[in-house]
Structure formats: C-alpha cells, structure tokens
Amino acid sequence: MESTLGSDLARLVRVWRALIDHRLKPLELTQTHWVTLYNINRLPPEQSQIQLAKAIGIEQPSLVRTLDQLEEKGLITRHTCANDRRAKRIKLTEQSSPIIEQVDGVICSTRKEILGGISSDEIAVLSGLIDKLEKNIIQLQTK
C-alpha cells in the first residue's frame, strides 16, 4: 500500500492553519494577511519582497497584492532599497504592533494546545524527521 505521508502532512498544515484562522477572525485578517505579518515579524528587519516571498513559499506577484492590502490597512510600509531601486523593503508600522502581539499569542497558545499530551522527546523526534524529509527534498530538487 502506498504511503500517504505527504497528504497527511499537507492535511495537518491545512487544519492547523484553519484553526488559527478561526481564532484570528475577530482581527479581520485573512490567512494570507496573518501569515505574511507573522513572517515579516520573525524575519530580520526590512526584508525585501523577494526574501519574504521565499520565506512564505509563494511567488512574488502573489505577495504584492497582500502587501498592498496590508499597506492600505496601515500595518506595513514599503520603500525602495538604496542599493537596488527595483527592490522594495518592507517594514511593520507601529499600528501593527498590537495586532502582531495578538497573532503571535494566538499562534503560540494554539501550538501549545495542539501539542498537549505529546512529550518534548516525541516533538524532538518529529522535528528531526521533518528536517530529514526537507533535506531529502532539497537534495532531490538540486539534481
């Protein structure tokens, strides 16, 4: 019988994000918005749009629309990079700070609840296996 591990992992990510999405409804952020804000916040300051798109795992044109919406909401600013006038740097605004705090809080508390009843050793084993799978995939992509 063929392994369904890939489908199982994809489903896990989908339901995990859906739960966070549901809990963040009061903030009126779409999943795309909160994932983007979360990644901007955890990356080094003033990342380029290209670097952010890579971190999120989406194409840059898809990201631009989301950034336009976040800029309209006053949550980010974008400015031209001094070294490369074609590149745009992204910065969180002060207005985004309380929202980022809430998003981060929901993500952390949800993670804690989801992982409840699973030992730290089990989590470490799972993380190690996921790392190995990712390395295998990256190696296969470079062949």
Swiss-Prot record:
GO CC terms: protein-DNA complex
PANTHER family membership: TRANSCRIPTIONAL REGULATOR SLYA, TRANSCRIPTIONAL REGULATOR, MARR FAMILY
Keyword Metal-binding: no
Its job: Transcription regulator that can specifically activate or repress expression of target genes.
Record-given protein name: Transcriptional regulator SlyA
Taxonomic placement: Bacteria, Pseudomonadati, Pseudomonadota, Gammaproteobacteria, Enterobacterales
GO molecular function: DNA-binding transcription activator activity; DNA-binding transcription repressor activity; transcription cis-regulatory region binding
HTH marR-type domain residues: 2-135
Summary of subunit composition and partner proteins: Homodimer.
